[in-house]
C-alpha cells in the first residue's frame, strides 16, 4: 500500500513538473508571435497544460501530499534557453520547431515516469497517459507551422 502511495505521488509530481514546463514555456513564447493561427494553437495548448496541472495538484492533495513543481533553477534554465534560441529568430517556424522538440521531450518524460512508477493507481496512470497523448497530438499540430 505504501509503495502504491509513493508511486502515486511520484507519478503525479512528474505530471505537475511536465505540465509546468509546458505551461511556462508557452507563456514565454505566446507574446513572441503575431501569427494568429499559431498563437491560437499555443493558447489552446497552454489551457490544456493548465487543466492537467490542476488535476495533478488536486490528486496529490487528495493523497495527502504537497506538489513541489519545477525548481527555480529548472525554470531559469528553461527561460534562458528560450531567450537564447529566440534572440535572433522569432519566426513561427523557429518557435514551432522549439515547441515540437519540447513536446517530444515531454512525451519521453511521460513514458519514463510511467515505467518508473508501475504501482501507481489507475487514476494517476490515466492522467499521465492523457498528458502523453496530448503532447503527442500537440507535436503533430505544431509540425504544420514548420
Regions from the PLM with identified roles:
Residues 1-146:
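Amphipathic alpha-helical hairpins
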Amino acid at each position: 500500500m505504501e509503495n502504491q502511495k509513493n508511486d502515486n505521488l511520484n507519478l503525479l509530481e512528474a505530471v505537475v513538473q511536465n505540465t509546468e514546463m509546458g505551461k511556462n514555456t508557452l507563456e514565454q513564447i505566446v507574446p513572441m508571435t503575431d501569427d494568429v493561427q499559431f498563437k491560437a494553437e499555443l493558447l489552446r495548448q497552454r489551457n490544456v497544460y493548465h487543466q492537467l496541472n490542476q488535476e495533478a495538484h488536486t490528486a496529490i492533495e487528495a493523497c495527502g501530499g504537497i506538489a513541489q513543481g519545477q525548481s527555480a533553477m529548472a525554470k531559469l534554465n528553461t527561460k534562458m534557453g528560450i531567450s537564447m534560441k529566440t534572440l535572433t529568430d522569432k519566426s513561427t517556424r523557429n518557435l514551432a520547431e522549439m515547441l515540437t522538440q519540447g513536446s517530444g521531450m515531454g512525451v519521453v518524460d511521460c513514458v519514463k515516469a510511467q515505467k518508473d512508477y508501475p504501482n501507481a493507481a489507475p487514476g494517476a496512470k490515466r492522467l499521465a497517459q492523457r498528458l502523453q497523448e496530448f503532447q503527442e497530438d500537440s507535436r503533430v499540430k505544431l509540425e504544420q507551422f514548420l
